[in-house]
Amino acid sequence: MLKNILLCSLQISLLGMSLGGNVLIWPMEGSHWLNVKIIIDELLRKEHNVTVLVASGALFITPSSISPSLTFEIYPVPFGKEKIESVIKDFVLTWLENRPSPSTIWTFYKEMAKVIEEFHLVSRGICDGVLKNEKLMSKLQKEKFEVLLSDPVFPCGDIVALKLGIPFIYSLRFSPASTVEKHCGKVPFPPSYVPAILSELTDQMSFTDRVRNFISYRMQDYMFETLWKQWDSYYTKALGRPTTLCETMGKAEIWLMRTYWDFEFPRPYLPNFEFVGGLHCKPAKPLPKEMEEFVQTSGEHGIVVFSLGSMVKNLTDEKANLIASALAQIPQKVLWRYKGKIPDTLGSNTRLFDWIPQNDLLGHPKTRAFITHGGTNGIYEAIYHGIPMVGVPMFADQPDNIAHMKAKGAAVEVNMNTMTSSDLLNALRTVINEPSYKENAMRLSRIHHDQPVKPLDRAVFWIEFVMRHKGAKHLRVAAHDLSWFQYHSLDVIGFLLACVASAILLVAKCCLFIFQKVGKTGKKKKRD
């Protein structure tokens, strides 16, 4: 009897394995990897087989053997971890030193172009590491993958998918001014009311704001055309036919966008764009004993959680002391993720940690506020738990993210470059003491939780959907098949203008003919 039960269990187990899909991952570094890793874990839980392509010089992606269904294919590239770390560091410093503003915009783009060129060199090394590795490509071909999940920030995932003859899905937070979503994904972005990403604008724009928004879109379009155009020849050579980066990216079956309407302003989107913002969020777990004891000493005042993310390791002594001085003046206890020199002005209410369980702290009932750099992952954890924020944005989408939270009444912003100790102190007192900030944060939290399907389940559903149906062509808009002048109906407008011009010309000719006839008749009568 026991033997039969064991055999039955084994058969069910094998059946589950056979029904599992075969997923290939083309990942991106940093926080992008953290989001994809959450999806991978859920795919593994649902008994899919997952293979992750990892460059030998990867910085954040650490191969692990958490499951026999998870495989890391490590391929050689002509650089080490130091190179990727250097590019990331240059990117952050360039943004910190030249944060886009009307007075610094051209300097910013000039300096950022250099960093992007360096990024392209690294990306090309990664592409070559896979596409020119015949042994690896042959092995991948034999694995019979059913779908590839890619982060479009790193090019070539789409090429790998097309080479293997499988559909691919994108996981994306944003591209500058949504150039990729707009030009490659064909999503409409009316500049009259849809703020360009990185513009720090909202959907409530004055005339001046709309001018600024329009210019922001055009400038980012220009940047995309000039800095990413070089990939067109690479894609053409790799695929063996004339094509472009954008045309190839447009073949993505589904775009998993890492935001949701608790964060975004209302705007048009397409049916193959799915929102999965906050897929990494989860209920808080108990804190480590020592940390919980410190939190409990806060009494009725509660705690403040402070983190500038993983990209900023430390601050200048002056800035650290300025911050510590402000934190020392609030009655709350503060848990600060910080690895630098201990500030001289550090108060007895503040404790420093190399690392903090951020999600668990934000979900703690004693948490009153979150001081954040404005990364999307951190903001979503605050939304999930209904915690008001003090934003200290520094680079990339962070200023834009905080602008969204300010517009929704859940955050106050301070400028890292110009803030004083009193600025930070006043911002903290505002979000802690004014009830509207907590109320708005809770409203966003309720919106986030009130979804028919959880973000992570939605992401996995669409990956499985594409595997089941070999794609999602029924969701692909016909705009992909049109040229740019057809898309904007310029041929139709030209035809109609020609018709109107022809009609006007015909009427004018008729009038002239009639006038001439009448004139001749009048002259003839006078002569008679």
UniProtKB/Swiss-Prot annotation:
Cell compartments where the protein resides: Membrane
PROSITE patterns: UDPGT
Keyword Glycoprotein included in the entry's annotation: yes
Family: Belongs to the UDP-glycosyltransferase family.
Biological-process GO terms, alphabetical: bile acid metabolic process; response to symbiont; sensory perception of smell; xenobiotic metabolic process
Gene name per UniProt: Ugt2a1
Chain ranges on the Extracellular side, renumbered to this chain: 22-494
Position of the signal peptide: 1-21
Role, per record: UDP-glucuronosyltransferase (UGT) that catalyzes phase II biotransformation reactions in which lipophilic substrates are conjugated with glucuronic acid to increase the metabolite's water solubility, thereby facilitating excretion into either the urine or bile. Essential for the elimination and detoxification of drugs, xenobiotics and endogenous compounds. Catalyzes the glucuronidation of endogenous steroid hormones such as androgens (testosterones) and estrogens (estradiol and estriol).
Source organism: Mus musculus
Main location: membrane
Segments passing through the bilayer: 495-515
Side Cytoplasmic, residues: 516-528
Protein name: UDP-glucuronosyltransferase 2A1
Record keywords: Glycoprotein, Glycosyltransferase, Lipid metabolism, Membrane, Olfaction, Sensory transduction, Signal, Transferase, Transmembrane, Transmembrane helix
Modified residues (N6-succinyllysine): 135
